[in-house]
Amino acid sequence: GIAGWIAAIFLLMFVGAGFAFIIENAAPAMVLGAARCGGAFFLFRQFDDNDFVEQFALVVSLVGQGLIAFGLGEILRMEGAPFYIALAIVEAGLALLIPNFLHRVLTTGGAAIALALAIKVMSLHGLAAPLLCIGLAWIWLEPRLWAGSGRLWRPVGYGLMLAVLLVEMFRLFAMDEWVTGASRPAEWLALYGPLIGRGVTAAILVWVAIALCRREGHGPGSRIGMAAIGGAILFGLLALNAPGLATAVLVLLLGFAAGNRVLMALGILGLFLFVGHFYYSLHATLLEKSGLLAVTGMVLLGAWFLLKRSGTHAAATEAADA
């Protein structure tokens, strides 16, 4: 794998030196980038099980995408929303066309992040993450996608998961402004847009909890259903004041439902990150913060106890009915 990257980098440096005059203009750069993506597509299709060739083709495709992005930036102006929308379309097309797992993860993530940046440029603050969460929940909760086209949708699901966590992190630390610059949204949207976005994400979390309960045969009125939905509502309410919390819990919940350790690990990592940021950004004394942590811990322990007791009672009831 590493040998493929080294070989591709040296080859591209040599070719880039020879075609430096071409990439100074937008149209030739886009043509050259499309040609490299086409070459990567051919390599992926012809050498599906060759690690060296696959890594080589991945580097070639990434460079091609960079050239296409440069050309689009020259034509559409890199600070505008049309550039990011066009880039998202290109990345989504590559994710559909090129049949490689890692390539699809990266291009899906690139498309989702480009779409989020377009939403940011349009001053729709806080609305990118819930939009991506809808797609994330739909993919990981729909078994027919996995049964029919798992080779396509599995990497797309991973790419969306990485993108939504990165988008939340970028927004949390204002890193998106490094790319798009500071924008001036309408006053009401600047005040309430992020809160609306967190509320929508919390609603998605509750919807996922209801869907998972029904899939396991527990109605919303059952003990397990009420406990699960109540826990989701509790986390949703907490997330209104803790950016990123609902997204991390959503990823963790989807990972647990799918039995996917990667999703669970990244959900837990995101949970620690967003809770830590919320803790250190609180304008409170250390005593008040410690009290908040203690109360949160007791609430979580109480929720765990109720869920365990409800599960045991439900299992005993089913055994008695049988």
Predicted regions and their residues:
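Alpha-helical multi-pass membrane segments and their bilayer interfacial helix-loop junctions
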Residues: G1-A322
